[in-house]
């Protein structure tokens, strides 16, 4: 379970693209297509890392991250926000909600995979 990544994004093309690149690097992937499902899966499955879109139906990524941190304060699950937003205020909101990192769309998949590996290595869960 040390390589399980939850991808939470309502854009199915982004999900397929990210999932493919992570699987090619040996990661297992689970997917949520809205914020509520993302929170439920994060709490139920306990992924090693979460890639979280900021703008999703039912609950935005900031709220998902904040609720996850509130409901599981002991869980040290790294959260990387994926977003089309590039304003500093948005980045600040992400970090305030408890995010560990930020990637702006469009992104280089090699950079994203590298960030995933770095955060898992920092957590001691990368294989």
Model-identified regions with their sequence ranges:
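Charged docking surfaces used in two-component/phosphorelay signaling
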Residues: 16-24
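Short hydrophobic/Thr-rich beta-strand motif most characteristic of the beta2 strand and flanking loop
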Residues: 26-33, 41
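Active-site beta3 strand of CheY-like receiver
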Residues: 45-51
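Receiver (REC) domain active-site loop signature in two-component systems and cognate sites
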Residues: 56
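C-terminal output helix
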Residues: 107-116
């Amino acid at each position: 379970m040390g390589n399980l990544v939850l991808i939470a994004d309502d854009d199915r093309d982004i999900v397929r693209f990210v999932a493919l690149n992570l699987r090619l690097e040996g990661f297992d992937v689970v997917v949520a297509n809205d914020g509520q499902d993302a929170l439920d899966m994060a709490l139920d499955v306990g992924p090693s890392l979460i890639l979280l879109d900021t703008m999703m139906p039912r609950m935005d990524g900031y709220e998902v991250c904040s609720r996850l941190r509130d409901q599981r304060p002991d869980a040290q699950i790294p959260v990387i926000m994926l977003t089309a937003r590039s304003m500093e205020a948005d980045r600040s909101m992400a970090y305030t909600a408890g995010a560990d990192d930020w990637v702006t769309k469009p992104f280089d998949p090699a950079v994203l995979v590298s960030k995933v590996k770095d955060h898992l290595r920092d957590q001691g869960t990368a294989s």
